């Protein structure tokens, strides 16, 4: 197996996750890899197109290397009609992490040795909780200073040595910089909702939500949804998403 064991990091909501009497139904998207042994305890089946997703599915799991592009295709073609979806990667690829998060994934895990850990993570994801592999969450904490690069190896953003325009330091919680409305939008964004879905739930125009996000990105010193999510979720002061 690749990567360290995935333990639920600080991105999991403290709200207890209800126990399910029936096993999770997992729609598995994987083109070349064999089924991961970790999902054998669930009702899982292979799917190749978004139209194959069933209303009874609890989670869509994209398994294998560089599945971000396929995840984006599913998300776009389903037009918001997917259950919570996540990636189980065979190796850590920062470009793929950001592509998956930008496309609405609420989980990005690495292959693990203990099936019980993945089972717990998938149950949390099925209830809308965001789960990141510890390596991803820790990297976000270390490089989460305003204006700094969230993933230096992929050069998503160049470090800003001049500091933030707001005068905040890397030790400040990202939530402190945001208004209550902006925090609510980030909470919903972290749960995997699209701009359209956030607008509907908050009874706002889509343009208004996009304007809010533009201001949020500026305050957090980031340039994209994935960077904002890593900053928001990876920082110890970040807030978790729950429905």
UniProtKB/Swiss-Prot annotation:
SMART domains named among the record's database cross-references: HTH_LUXR
CDD domains in the record: LuxR_C_like
Pfam family, any one: GerE
PROSITE patterns assigned: HTH_LUXR_1 (PS00622), HTH_LUXR_2 (PS50043)
GO-annotated molecular function: DNA binding
Keywords: Antibiotic biosynthesis, DNA-binding, Transcription, Transcription regulation
Family annotation (InterPro entries): Sig_transdc_resp-reg_C-effctor, Tscrpt_reg_LuxR_C
Biological pathway: Antibiotic biosynthesis
A biological process term (GO) from this entry: regulation of DNA-templated transcription
Biased composition (Polar residues): 161-178
Ranges where the record places region Disordered: 154-179
DNA-binding segment(s): 195-214
Domain HTH luxR-type intervals: 171-236
Task of the protein: Probable DNA-binding protein that contributes to the control of expression of the biosynthesis operon of the 16-membered macrolide antibiotics FD-891 and FD-892. Might be a member of a two-component regulatory system; the putative sensor kinase gene is unknown.
Miscellaneous comment text of the record: The macrolide antibiotics FD-891 and FD-892 induce morphological changes of human promyelocytic leukemia (HL-60) cells and have cytocidal activity against tumor cell lines in vitro. FD-891 produced by Streptomyces sp. MAFF 225003 and MAFF 225006 inhibits growth of rice and alfalfa seedlings and may cause russet scab in potatoes.
Protein name (record): Probable HTH-type transcriptional regulator GfsR
């Amino acid at each position: 197996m690749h990567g360290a064991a995935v333990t639920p990091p600080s991105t999991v909501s403290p709200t207890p996750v209800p126990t399910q009497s029936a096993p999770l139904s997992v729609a598995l998207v994987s083109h070349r890899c064999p089924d991961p042994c970790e999902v054998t305890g669930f009702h899982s089946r292979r799917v190749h197109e978004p139209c194959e997703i069933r209303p009874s599915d609890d989670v869509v799991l994209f398994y294998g290397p560089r599945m971000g592009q396929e995840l984006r295709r599913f998300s776009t073609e389903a037009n918001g009609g997917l259950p919570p979806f996540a990636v189980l990667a065979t190796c850590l690829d920062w470009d793929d992490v950001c592509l998956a998060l930008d496309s609405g994934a609420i989980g990005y895990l690495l292959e693990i040795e203990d099936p019980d850990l993945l089972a717990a993570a998938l149950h949390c994801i099925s209830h809308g909780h965001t789960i990141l592999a510890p390596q991803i969450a820790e990297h976000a904490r270390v490089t989460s200073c305003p204006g700094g690069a969230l993933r230096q190896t992929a050069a998503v953003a160049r470090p800003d040595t001049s500091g933030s325009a707001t005068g905040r330091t890397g030790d400040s919680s990202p939530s402190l910089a945001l208004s209550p409305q902006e925090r609510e939008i980030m909470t919903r964004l972290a749960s995997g909702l699209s701009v359209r879905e956030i607008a509907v739930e908050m009874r706002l125009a889509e343009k208004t939500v996009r304007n809010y996000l533009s201001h949020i990105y500026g305050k957090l010193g980031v340039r994209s949804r994935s960077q904002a999510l890593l900053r928001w979720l990876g920082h110890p002061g970040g807030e978790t998403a729950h429905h």
